[in-house]
């Protein structure tokens, strides 16, 4: 009986160490920002998802691997996941609001310098945070990130188009004709492996790219601040890893 109890206690402790935790804080403008925590050992890393506007759970494969050796914080950026906005407009999606959110997370985690792991837009947001709050970052890790300025958009589209097949282009035109978002059509162009692209496409919600969605509003403001960001980034002296 004692052995059974010990086994049960061990399993219970193991589950609690590896289970998901959900918490939140209120940002400067009163928006409640949620985050999830996976794993409990090792260094703390903050995962910043792409979009802007994608539900962060598409990074599940990544944090399920990392949680074995790290404490992973999955931030639900404003307007995504559980971090709902009362109003989605240009004011609520300014880059400075995202920076306020990361400052709130920084305080919530005890004021320890952050290790930011940014995918796509998440990397672009990491640049913005480093430009404005360089002393609060320990390290930046970029996963298929966009650039520091909006100049990368000029070749970004070409890289996507060269991977598209006739069937993708047909769907692209159909989406335009039906006034639907085109990302569902060009999604395979973001991947080296088409099979993986097609496998990940169905669960995604592409409404975030609609005219009044998170994507055009947040990325639009980010593009406006390119010169300012480049100038301020000179103050960040920490390491940046590119993957």
Predicted features along the sequence, with ranges:
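Conserved hydrolase catalytic core segment
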Residues: 112-154
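Bacterial Sec-dependent N-terminal signal peptides
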Residues: 1-22, 241
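Short beta-strand/loop motif that positions the catalytic acidic residue
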Residues: 236, 242-243
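Conserved HGGG/HGGXW glycine-rich cap/lid loop of the alpha/beta-hydrolase fold
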Residues: 27-85
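Active-site acidic short loop of glycosyltransferases
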Residues: 40-42, 68, 107-112, 135, ...
């Amino acid at each position: 009986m004692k052995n059974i109890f010990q086994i049960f206690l061990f399993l219970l402790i193991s589950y609690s160490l590896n289970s998901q935790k959900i918490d939140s804080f209120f940002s400067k403008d009163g928006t409640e920002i949620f985050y999830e925590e996976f794993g409990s050992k090792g260094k703390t890393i903050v995962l910043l998802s792409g979009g802007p506007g994608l539900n962060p759970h598409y990074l599940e494969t990544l944090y399920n691997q990392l949680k074995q050796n790290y404490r992973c914080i999955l931030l639900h950026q404003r307007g995504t996941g559980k971090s709902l906005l009362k109003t989605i407009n240009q004011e609520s999606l300014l880059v400075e609001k995202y920076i306020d959110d990361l400052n709130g997370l920084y305080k919530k985690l005890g004021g320890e310098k952050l290790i930011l792991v940014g995918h796509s837009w998440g990397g672009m947001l990491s640049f913005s945070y480093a430009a404005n709050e360089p002393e609060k970052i320990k390290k930046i890790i970029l996963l298929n990130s966009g650039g520091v300025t909006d100049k990368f958009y000029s070749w970004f589209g070409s890289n996507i188009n060269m991977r598209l097949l006739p069937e993708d282009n047909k769907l692209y035109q159909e989406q335009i004709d039906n006034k639907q978002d085109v990302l569902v059509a060009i999604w395979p162009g973001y991947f080296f492996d088409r099979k993986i692209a097609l496998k990940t496409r169905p669960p995604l919600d592409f409404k975030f790219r609609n005219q009044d969605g998170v994507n055009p509003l947040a990325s639009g403001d980010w593009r406006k601040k390119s010169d300012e960001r480049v100038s301020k980034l000179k103050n960040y002296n920490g390491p940046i890893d590119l993957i």
